[in-house]
Amino acid sequence: HEKEFLSDKAAILSLFGLSVAWFGDNLPPPLRARVLAVQGMIAVGFIAFMLFASNPFARLMPAPADGEGLNPILQDPGLAMHPPMLYLGYVGFSMAFSFAVAALIDGKVDAAWARWVRPWTLAAWIALTLGIGLGSHWAYYTLGWGGWWFWDPVENASLMPWLLGTALLHSAIVVEKRDGLKSWTILLAIMTFAMSLIGTFLVRSGVLTSVHSFAVDPARGLFILGLLVVTIGGSLLLFALRAPALQG
């Protein structure tokens, strides 16, 4: 599960980058180049993590003659779509993050930028909403899982980027319609993706105790923490240096 999780994220990151390359003809070439560069660097980070810390292509030796299979309680159509939708939402917010970093480098946030970033943010928000909803529906009729919402740490880790993504959608509208909240919108774009990475770190590092169970490896947690520090720390430093020029 752990290795599939990483390969799924890397694949989704690559697909989002390809989408911008193929369908981003309406973007100014410098902005599109910077968005693709940021998206590519994030993808490289996850691919490096996958290859060096959790290689999905590593052979299992010795291979079990007869595996145990999936827990029957998890064999549910809705639950089959729950993780992919969450991953699509988490990774989808990387597009808003990439647009935010590109805007900080350009020193320009305007109505056109807001129109470009909103569809990507909305797509990620819808995917995350579906993922949370499918998981909640499954938990409701599964005995002993706590009902619709248990305020479990892993559930809360998915809720935080959803709340920030909701705020980002509304803030982008203000940028587009009133030319205001520019710095706030950029910060929301950064923090929404930051919470996606922080949630991944907390869940996969074993820091949290949860009714959700995952394969835990402290070394992998440290790798994710390093990726988090570089990605989010660098973007927040750039924000501190460039945001004053975006006020308006």
Model-derived features with residue positions:
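Polytopic transmembrane helical bundles with strong interfacial aromatic enrichment
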Residues: 1-248
